[in-house]
């Protein structure tokens, strides 16, 4: 892309997802902001901004994926540095918002950590948050600053449309994901099915029943996050057992922790389509996994925010 040409737009990256950050700046046509994110000898974060940002719209790109605590602390310190350097606005771009699954008190005496993270970002000095497919949309209400939540479904829909799959059914792996599945199904002009599951303890899922017709069909399971891959692989195996012709799976955020890769390798999933909101280690880039880039979407959102244009067109 040609140079954007506005010196008042500054984009900086921290350590969690540099590949995506550089894709975004290349897409916009601006150089990456000059800064260093290092550690003191005792492990404390040291940040230095190496250019003037006075009066600029600053965008900080950082997924708060594992190690989540390290990446959150980097982001908070960077926000403080930018604020003290007299930036006009501090726009925090968080492709993957860590701690989003801790959005409510599931049991007595539990914290609501997603709200705590929101408080920390605001207190540090963030003036806007730009993110993608929050695990719980109500997290937007945890902030008293603007939150732009972009959607990954159009990217996934375009990918599957180009594959030209026949007789598709879109599957939600649980009742909570029905709205997401419906959005993909509407774009693919396909019916939906639902996996009715019971989760006896965290990261352990048991498939109980399938609601909807899947026999002889090509199933596409969609979720927002795949962590240990227990839910998605059990769902895929159950779909095949109930007569699905083949099974694809997709998600926005590939956490892929613990036994996830082995489970995916050994599952009935033909292809897992993910996005690059989280940078995957080399050993996780197996043949079954296809990665799509969110850089064009996020670059467009950044430019629109900077130019005070509407971002709502990017929400659907």
From Swiss-Prot:
GO terms for biological process: 5-phosphoribose 1-diphosphate biosynthetic process; purine nucleotide biosynthetic process; ribonucleoside monophosphate biosynthetic process. Pathway: Metabolic intermediate biosynthesis; 5-phospho-alpha-D-ribose 1-diphosphate biosynthesis; 5-phospho-alpha-D-ribose 1-diphosphate from D-ribose 5-phosphate (route I): step 1/1. SUPFAM superfamilies: PRTase-like. Mg(2+) 2 binds at residue 174. It catalyses: D-ribose 5-phosphate + ATP = 5-phospho-alpha-D-ribose 1-diphosphate + AMP + H(+). SMART domains: Pribosyltran_N. ATP binds at residues 42-44, 101-102. Binds 2 Mg(2+) ions per subunit. The active site is at residue 197. Its EC number is 2.7.6.1. Disulfide bonds: none annotated. GO terms for cellular component: cytoplasm; ribose phosphate diphosphokinase complex. NCBIfam families: PRK01259.1, PRK02269.1, ribP_PPkin. Belongs to the ribose-phosphate pyrophosphokinase family. Class I subfamily. This is Ribose-phosphate pyrophosphokinase. The lineage of its organism: Bacteria, Bacillati, Bacillota, Bacilli, Bacillales.
């Amino acid at each position: 892309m040609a140079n954007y040409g506005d010196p008042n737009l500054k984009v900086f990256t921290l350590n969690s997802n540099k590949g995506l950050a550089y894709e975004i700046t290349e897409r916009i046509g601006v150089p990456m902001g000059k800064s260093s994110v290092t550690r003191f000898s005792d492990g404390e974060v040291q940040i230095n901004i190496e250019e003037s940002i006075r009066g600029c719209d600053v965008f900080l790109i950082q997924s708060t994926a594992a190690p989540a605590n390290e990446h959150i602390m980097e982001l908070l310190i960077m926000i403080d540095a930018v604020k003290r350097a007299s930036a006009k606005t501090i726009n925090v771009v968080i492709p993957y918002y860590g701690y989003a699954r801790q959005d409510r008190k599931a049991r007595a005496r539990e914290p609501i950590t997603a709200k705590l993270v929101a408080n920390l970002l605001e207190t540090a000095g963030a003036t806007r948050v730009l993110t993608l497919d929050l695990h719980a949309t109500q997290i937007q209400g945890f902030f008293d600053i603007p939150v732009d939540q972009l959607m990954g479904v159009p990217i996934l829909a375009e990918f599957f449309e180009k594959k030209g799959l026949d007789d598709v059914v879109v599957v939600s792996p649980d009742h909570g994901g029905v709205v997401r599945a419906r959005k993909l199904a509407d774009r693919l002009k396909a019916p939906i099915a639902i996996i009715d599951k019971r989760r006896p303890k965290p990261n352990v899922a048991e498939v109980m029943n399938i609601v909807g017709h899947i026999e002889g069909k090509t199933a596409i399971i969609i979720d927002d996050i795949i962590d240990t891959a227990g839910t998605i692989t059990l769902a895929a195996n159950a779909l095949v057992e109930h007569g699905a012709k083949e099974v694809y799976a997709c998600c926005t955020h590939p956490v892929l922790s613990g036994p996830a890769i082995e489970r995916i390798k050994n599952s009935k999933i033909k292809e897992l389509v993910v996005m690059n909101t989280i940078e995957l280690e080399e050993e996780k880039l197996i043949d079954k996994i296809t990665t799509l880039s969110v850089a064009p979407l996020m670059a467009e959102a950044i430019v629109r925010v900077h130019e005070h244009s509407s971002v709502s067109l990017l929400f659907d």
